[in-house]
Amino acid sequence: MFYYEYVRYLVRAFAADAESLIDVGSGNAEYIEDFYWIHTRHALDRKRPYSSAAVAGIEAEFLTFEAGRTYDFALCLQVLEHVKRAKPFAEKLFSVADRVMISVPYQWPPGLEKGHVHDPVDLDKLRHWTGRDPDYSVVVSEPLTDSPGRSRLIAYYHPAGSEFSLRDMGRNMRPERPDRNPNLPNLLSRLAVVWRRGNRA
């Protein structure tokens, strides 16, 4: 999906200097493998978390999970819409990591997806759950489809009181994983100039 390419692109920028990452509600998604420069990678899920030689899986309920540490970066992708107690869940993300990136389905109609308990979700609802405004947000829509479930909102939260510059993050972003399908053109690289122009610090 185009959405996952966008996630990979943003993590390469926003987590370029991260040494630890936790993916909350990982399911069995393998995208965490692409963040090769992050030494400590944990994938947490209430059942069957993703795991590999490079990624430690943690089977736990996030609301009762005790991290025992602060991660540099937390991901929570397409999870909150499934969680009845979305507000305490979202707020806890900021207690386990310095930087947080969240994605949610954007304005999907109720009943479109079984298991979603909060649709439709938009930036106002996400702001209510997290109690804060994102430092960067973007709505990513899948191309070549008119499905009502084609769009997702991605929001990034930088630590309060620390300098935040999209320009610097764009300059310092990590290269794509060397062994990740070298014959596949990275379409998002072509959008980098547009992205930077549209989001100048």
Regions found by a protein language model. Give the residues of each.
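Conserved beta-strand signature within the Rossmann-like core of class I S-adenosyl-L-methionine
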Residues: 97-109
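Flexible loop residues that form catalytic
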Residues: 46, 79, 105
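Conserved N-terminal segment of class I S-adenosyl-L-methionine
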Residues: 1-73, 87-90, 95, 114-200
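Helix-to-beta-strand junctions that scaffold the AdoMet/dcAdoMet cofactor pocket
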Residues: 83-84, 97
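Active-site segment flanking the S-adenosylmethionine/decSAM binding pocket
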Residues: 84-89, 105
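A short beta-strand submotif of the Rossmann-like class I SAM-dependent methyltransferase core
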Residues: 73-79
